């Protein structure tokens, strides 16, 4: 699920403890 962080965050995001964090 972490691999889709970039798409969900539109390019800016990190995966922490299995969760997506957008910046």
UniProtKB/Swiss-Prot annotation:
One MF term in the entry's GO annotations: potassium channel inhibitor activity
The UniProt record lists the keyword Ligase: no
Annotated site residue numbers, Aromatic residue of the functional dyad: 23
Disulphide bond pairs: 2-15, 5-20, 9-22
Main location: secreted
Tissue note: Expressed by the venom gland.
Subcellular location: Secreted
Site feature Basic residue of the functional dyad, where: 14
Biological process, per Gene Ontology: envenomation resulting in negative regulation of voltage-gated potassium channel activity in another organism
GO cellular component: extracellular region
InterPro entries xrefs: Scorpion_toxin-like_sf
KW Disulfide bond (keyword) present: yes
Keywords: Disulfide bond, Ion channel impairing toxin, Neurotoxin, Potassium channel impairing toxin, Secreted, Toxin
Membrane-spanning residues: none
Region feature Interaction with Ca(2+)-activated K(+) channels, mapped onto this chain: 13-20
This protein's domain notes: Has the structural arrangement of an alpha-helix connected to a beta-sheet by disulfide bonds (CSalpha/beta).
Protein task: Blocks reversibly Shaker B potassium channels. Also displaces binding of noxiustoxin to mouse brain synaptosome membranes.
Family of this protein: Belongs to the short scorpion toxin superfamily. Potassium channel inhibitor family. Alpha-KTx 13 subfamily.
Name recorded for this polypeptide: Potassium channel toxin alpha-KTx 13.1
């Amino acid at each position: 699920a972490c691999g889709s962080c970039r798409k969900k965050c539109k390019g800016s995001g990190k995966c922490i403890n299995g969760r997506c964090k957008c910046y």
